[in-house]
Amino acid sequence: ELDILSSEVAISLYTQNIEYKELASRIVISNHHKNTLSSFSEITEILYNYVRHEKSDSLINEDYYRRIMEHKDIINDKINDYLDYKFDYFGFNTLFKSYLLKVDGIPIERPQHMLMRVALSIHKTDLDLAFETYDYMSNRYFIHATPTLFNAGSNREQFSSCFLLMMSDDSVKGIYETLSDCAQISKYAGGIGLAIHNIRAKDSFIAGTNGISNG
């Protein structure tokens, strides 16, 4: 709690001196490291063996888990936790609140764990490409989009950011089927563009009900 309070005081002063922002980020990241395991494979095991309400509720998929366990020593050695300090205060807090995988509402991943999870999930058994991707992301050359960060390694590996849909039919059934599809996409962090040009115009006749469309 003292670390959190200190970081909040520091960030409140950064408009007076920009170095307070650096101090705040170092405090919150150091605090997170104190409260989490450094071993990527141990974190993976916790996520895989998670139990909710006395029922197995694995947060990662079995294929991903077995790949990690098979190569855990080389993967653990590749993680560089110091690179977490490349994130600024606001960037880290965004990861902490929304992106790092949680157990019982508490983030247990470190930022480097998240980046390695993404790299290994994308490149599967090709460790060389996975490590190259991890190196690029951890050194801030690029980062993947939100759905990839959310879903990599999970039981719902949906990586796409954007979906373009059209109303499946100009009817109550067609409209609500399309809205259901939109809800499922949104559930896993996909963005949606929806075309409704095939819906009848306002004041058009509705034969099924002998009514008039509201448009």
Question: How would you describe each model-predicted region?
Answer:
Residues 1-215:
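Extended catalytic cores of very large enzyme megasubunits
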